[in-house]
Amino acid sequence: MKISILYSSKTGKTERVAKLIEEGVKRSGNIEVKTMNLDAVDKKFLQESEGIIFGTPTYYANISWEMKKWIDESSEFNLEGKLGAAFSTANSIAGGSDIALLTILNHLMVKGMLVYSGGVAFGKPKTHLGYVHINEIQENEDENARIFGERIANKVKQIF
């Protein structure tokens, strides 16, 4: 089984969180994972992935233009039936990350992906729409990113 983590990052913060999520996926065991910046996507690995996690910085309560452009131009990939999840980074808790996550999730559903957030059933961290990493809060944030990755990996194994 394979999981791709796709992200855009200008300052390195979203890239750092993508790598933390990758650590969580690896904790789940028996899943090959690759973390890729949107400008260096391994097309073969992505197409072979059962799960894809999308990550974006939050700008003005929205996704990065790079993520939007990639989604708009990704018709070469058949994502139907794959498990999709999303995470975002923001400088503050009121930065609009929930709206950014919903934007990604809407696009994933249009592409026919199954959408999973990690949910609230397993307790903290509760990820209603996906994982949000707030840059100004550090306590437990790194571990929460790992837990999110592990939960997505476990769901991929359960479904596929």
Swiss-Prot record:
Residue ranges spanning the membrane: these are: none
What this protein needs as a cofactor is: FMN
Sorted UniProt keywords: Electron transport, Flavoprotein, FMN, Transport
Q: Which residues form the Flavodoxin-like domain?
A: 3-153
Instruction: Quote the cellular component terms of the Gene Ontology held in the record.
Output: membrane
In Pfam terms, one family for this protein is FMN_red
**Entry's Gene Ontology molecular function annotations:** electron transfer activity; FMN binding; NAD(P)H dehydrogenase (quinone) activity
Q: Which domain of life is it from?
A: Bacteria
UniProt cross-references to InterPro entries, sorted A to Z: Flavodoxin/NO_synth, Flavodoxin_CS, Flavoprotein-like_sf, FMN_Rdtase-like_dom
Q: What does this protein do?
A: Low-potential electron donor to a number of redox enzymes.
Please report which protein family the annotation says this sequence is part of.
Answer: Belongs to the flavodoxin family.
Q: What name does this protein carry?
A: Flavodoxin
Species this protein is from: Clostridium saccharobutylicum
